Amino acid sequence: MRINRLKLTDFKAIQSADINFEGKSTIIFGINGTGKSTILRSVNLLYANIINQIVNRKELKQYYAIQLEDIRYGAKETQIRAEFDINGEDIEYGRRMVRSTGKKYENKDGIKRISDIFHEEYISDEIQGDIPIFANYGTNRLVLDIPLRIRTHHTFDIYSSLEKAIENKIDFRTFFEWYRNQEDYENEKKIELENLNYKDKSLEAVRAVSYTHLRAHETDQY
């Protein structure tokens, strides 16, 4: 799942933009005020609705809406459109807002098709594999809290990776809770299988990333 093309019309300071994304990654650079954050915000606005359509759970809802200040000064409305490639199928989805009425519109057929493919390919009764995820790391993304004690508990499932995907303010609360739960599960499996070398695949993936960024190894002694 990826964006192939992004079209902006009268969005913030951008009168018109047509951006084609090529390759596996894209770098957007420029001096202050050229619209880098504007482009990222437009992508967030599209994915917020897509995530809400796919998940449809209150606790994972992304509160990210087009505002009147997103409409370029002097323009009657603003529009954001993107062409998505999902497993080889091209789908267009867009959102717009009219200044005079404040009404917001979206391409319901496009977002429904994206959601349908997502569920068919990744979350059907027969398939429970890895899913495409979206994460926004804005310039002002903050870690507000690193809790040492977990007072509330969550039920983790395949949708949990999309929690707070758009928000700029985050904490590690649910991550630590998930990690502890997985460690308990891993230890239980060691006893059940009578194999002290058993490793949970999810934990191993997180450990590998952590050790890589710390420039450390699991066998290092301190």
Model-predicted regions and their roles:
Residues 1-181, 185, 190-208, 214:
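P-loop NTPase switch/coupling surface
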Residues 213-222:
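Single conserved hydrophobic/aromatic residue that forms the stacking wall/gate
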